A protein has these predicted regions:
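Serine-hydrolase-like catalytic core of hydrolytic proteins
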Residues: 2-4, 10, 96, 101-271, ...
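Non-catalytic accessory segments of hydrolases
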Residues: 10-182, 203, 297-299, 338-339, ...
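Accessory cap/linker subdomain of secreted extracellular hydrolases
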Residues: 73, 258-295
């Protein structure tokens, strides 16, 4: 009862008003939220949610590099709610719904949006651009609300990028080079560089940071000539360019693409014909087929960046040996308790072990889970 009273009291003191900011593509209207501050006056954060940084990657733009968004001038774009998250497994809901209390996740192939949180749009503050993790197959801006970080005096940008086959399908040649999701990230960084000054951010003080696959993405941007001009510092959390999940050989990616093609009745030795057939399938059918692919994740992830001679010119090992990377301040770290949020979902979903972990992991549960996990891996 006390916690409910405190919650109602805090909410009653929130003040919300609209704010409009200009970009190269037109004006954007977001919301300013003021929060109580025990040590002084209210603190405010301007939120601009669901801002398009690229054209919808649908139709002819599926399996293609992102293109800039179309200008919406003289209209004003409403940026008061999150944009749809990219198509992915609904497994994400098991992990995040209990934490962020989002009633519904909206999934769409049209998902190249970013969220901006600014403590003051009239200043020139450092900028932090967050790249979410999720094994290149799940995640989105809605899972990373950043009011608290913005209140520390930085402009925070959360970007989205295509996932799974939509972001990383490859044949190893010009039929499907791959890395569309990484190029989405580059396009988002370019958008930030061109527009963030109007949101109170300094385009000359941009730090990119991310966790897990977001961390490896950050490290790959340090190696990529496509993105080097758009950031100045980097933080890679629980993932770097040499992590086992960071990239995959092109031959492995081609094998996954061929398996996807078989499931969609698109099998062909002609890569162009195969990709064209997949391209013409419904997005929901592609996603469903991709989720049915099973790989041994002790080797590589199903979908991941590859050497495409565009975003990634050579393997990370080769580029590092040559010293061909952006030399900037870099923090590499791990994330404490990063698996804690997933434990409950895994316990109730994996191997039929429906046991509450509210009071911790019992010795019986641990031994049973370990035995079943080992058996599952041995039987692959």
């Amino acid at each position: 009862m006390l916690s409910a009273t405190l919650f109602i009291f805090c909410v009653s003191w929130l003040h919300v008003r609209a704010e409009t900011v200009s970009t190269r593509y037109g004006d954007i209207e977001g919301l300013v939220t003021s929060y109580p501050n025990v040590s002084g006056p209210f603190k405010s954060v301007s939120k601009f949610l669901g801002v398009p940084f690229a054209a919808p990657p649908t139709g002819e733009l599926r399996f293609k590099a992102p293109q800039p968004p179309k200008a919406w001038k003289p209209k004003v774009h409403s940026a008061k709610t999150h944009g749809s998250i990219c198509l992915q497994s609904k497994l994400i809901e098991l992990f995040f719904k209990p934490v962020i209390m989002t009633p519904n996740f909206n999934y769409s192939e049209d998902c190249l949006y970013l969220d901006i949180y600014s403590p003051n749009t009239s200043l020139s503050l450092p900028v932090m651009v967050y790249i979410h993790g999720g094994g290149y197959i799940v995640g989105g801006a809605v899972t990373s609300p950043s009011d608290i970080l913005a209140l520390q005096g930085v402009v925070v940008v959360i970007i989205q990028y295509r996932l799974g086959p939509f972001g990383f399908l490859t044949t190893g040649d010009s039929a499907a080079p791959g890395n569309y999701g990484m190029l989405d990230q580059v396009q988002a960084l370019k958008w930030v560089s061109e527009n963030i000054a109007n949101f109170g951010g300094n385009p000359s003080k941009v730090t990119i940071f991310g966790q897990s696959a977001g961390g490896s993405s950050v490290a790959l941007h340090v190696l990529s000539p496509r993105s080097r001009d758009f950031f100045h510092q980097a933080i890679a959390e629980s993932g770097v360019e040499l992590s086992s999940f960071a990239t995959q050989p092109t031959s492995f990616g081609l094998g996954i693409t061929k398996e996807l093609a078989q499931k969609l009745n698109c099998g062909s030795n002609d890569h162009y014909a195969m990709v064209s057939c997949i391209h013409n399938k419904r997005a929901s059918d592609i996603q469903k087929a991709a989720e049915s692919i099973r790989v041994d994740h002790s080797t590589y992830l199903s979908w991941a960046p590859v050497v495409d001679k565009n975003f990634l010119l050579e393997t990370p090992q080769s580029l590092k040996m040559k010293g061909d990377f952006k030399q900037i301040p870099l923090i590499i770290s791990f994330t404490s308790n990063e698996g804690a949020m997933a434990v409950g979902a895994l316990a109730s979903d994996s191997f039929g072990l429906n046991e509450s972990l509210d009071d911790g992991v019992s010795p019986t549960f641990f031994k049973t889970y370990l035995a079943k996990f080992a058996h599952a891996r041995d039987s692959r």
